[in-house]
Amino acid sequence: MSNIVWHDHKVTRAERSANKNQKPCLLWFTGLSGSGKSTIANALDVALHERGYHTFLLDGDNVRHGLCSDLGFSDDDRVENIRRVGEVCKLFADAGLIVMSAFISPFTSDRRMVRKLFPAGEFIEVFMDAPLETCESRDPKGLYKKARAGEIKHFTGIDSPYEVPSHPEIRLDTSQSTVDECVDSLIAYLQERELIKSN
């Protein structure tokens, strides 16, 4: 690493944000499989896009088709998966975008690692706090059924732990709130902190 140096860009992060007339941030959706991470993140992405904001959504399954296709689901691979994703999120935010990421990200230390990449107030942890029973009853990919049958090992919530965020910026329970209600809560949070404009 001693022969590698950091090159500053001529166009700054602040200038890129000003050009887009918005403030960059990362909304980090975390929770069990089936808790609504991708659903709510996608709905928020649409809502922000319709308001004219420049956004990008990174989804756990999609990232494993390319950037992280060489990784499995061991604890070490999960850590590396989140490390890579965190660095990519930072690059998107440096480009002035509002970034959303939807990853189980079960370990507190990994989420803390990503938080440290961002200036204060720009990392927004969104804990999808749906009960395991709700997530398992949805089971959109049939993964819980396979995990219960022993066909999938290291499945979060079944035989691998999920460390619940102690102080997330936002907590949403999709067993109690609709998609629209969740999006409204997220929009309100962003407006209150002047990350987006109030209507």
From Swiss-Prot:
Gene3D superfamilies according to UniProt: P-loop containing nucleotide triphosphate hydrolases
Binding site for ATP: G31, L32, S33, G34, S35, G36, K37, S38
Pathway linked to the protein: Sulfur metabolism; hydrogen sulfide biosynthesis; sulfite from sulfate: step 2/3
Keyword Nucleotide-binding: yes
SUPFAM superfamilies tied to this protein: P-loop containing nucleoside triphosphate hydrolases (SSF52540)
Active-site residues, record numbering mapped to chain: S105 (phosphoserine intermediate)
Single GO MF annotation: adenylylsulfate kinase activity
Keywords, in A-Z order: ATP-binding, Kinase, Nucleotide-binding, Phosphoprotein, Transferase
GO BP field: hydrogen sulfide biosynthetic process; sulfate assimilation
Enzyme kind, highest EC tier: transferase
Reactions catalysed: adenosine 5'-phosphosulfate + ATP = 3'-phosphoadenylyl sulfate + ADP + H(+)
Record bears the keyword rRNA processing: no
EC number(s) recorded for this UniProt protein: 2.7.1.25
Superkingdom as given in the UniProt entry: Bacteria
Pfam families assigned: APS_kinase
HAMAP family documented for this protein: Adenylyl_sulf_kinase
Family the UniProt entry places it in: Belongs to the APS kinase family.
Name of the featured protein: Adenylyl-sulfate kinase
Originating organism: Marinobacter nauticus (strain ATCC 700491 / DSM 11845 / VT8) (Marinobacter aquaeolei)
Lineage: Bacteria, Pseudomonadati, Pseudomonadota, Gammaproteobacteria, Pseudomonadales
